[in-house]
Amino acid sequence: MATELPYDLTPELAPLSWLIGSWEGQGRLGDGSADTEIFYQRVDFTELGLPFVEYRAESWLCEADGTLLRPLTVESGFWQVDRERRDGDVGPGMRPADIVPAFRSAEDVERLRAGDEGFGLTATIAHPGSLSELYYGRIKGPQLQLATEAILRGSAAGPYHRATRMAGLVNGQLFWRWDVADAAGAELEAHASAILDRMPSAAEGRLAPGAERPRGAGGRKQGEQS
């Protein structure tokens, strides 16, 4: 089904429009085998009227039936089409952008497309424990791939050397996977993966994490069939 774009959507967000909104569901740590721990996750991609989306993901360890056990972690950041800086961009810091936006139409944004490879994508993600990541990758239709370009670790950070992430929209559900290498020279290993359903946003009166939802309202549990 074609994505319907709001008339007032910032043009540069067109390639990311399928992500915008709230998502919830369950996943597993590690390689996803039956003996790995299950988590419940709520993800928000929020449009702010600027050429990037705000990202926030909250996760809780949970039982297979969705009962929350305890908080797991939170990560947040910003995702945007990768391009060179222009006068129409805000920042650094509180420096205001030029009143004329860098890209004023979808046709302008199309010039950033790299043919069949889609658009460049960059994401900055911050974690608890003094760890931040800078990712670069590609977004092509409802699929994306990212790999770390740089990682900032403070004294509270544990081993974490590089990572890749991928996500895609399949039958209206958001599938994602995250692979991590803890040390230089180490191979990437499965870190976590999940399948999320689109859910009402906070403004639309969404329920508390893990709350029982009417049948057909999303939030499929591990092991349930579509």
Swiss-Prot record:
Transmembrane segments: none annotated. Its cofactor is heme b. InterPro entries: Calycin (IPR012674), Nb(III)_bact/plant (IPR022939), Nitrobindin (IPR045165), THAP4-like_heme-bd (IPR014878). It comes from the Bacteria. Heme-binding protein able to scavenge peroxynitrite and to protect free L-tyrosine against peroxynitrite-mediated nitration, by acting as a peroxynitrite isomerase that converts peroxynitrite to nitrate. Therefore, this protein likely plays a role in peroxynitrite sensing and in the detoxification of reactive nitrogen and oxygen species (RNS and ROS, respectively). Is able to bind nitric oxide (NO) in vitro, but may act as a sensor of peroxynitrite levels in vivo. One of its GO terms (molecular function) is peroxynitrite isomerase activity. Its EC number is 5.99.-.-. Residues 201-226 are annotated as: Disordered. Keywords: Heme, Iron, Isomerase, Metal-binding. The keyword Iron applies. A motif (GXWXGXG) lies at residues 21-27. Binds 1 heme b group per subunit, that coordinates a highly solvent-exposed Fe(III) atom. CDD domains: lipocalin_heme-bd-THAP4-like. It holds the Pfam family THAP4_heme-bd. Heme b binds at residue 191. This is Peroxynitrite isomerase.
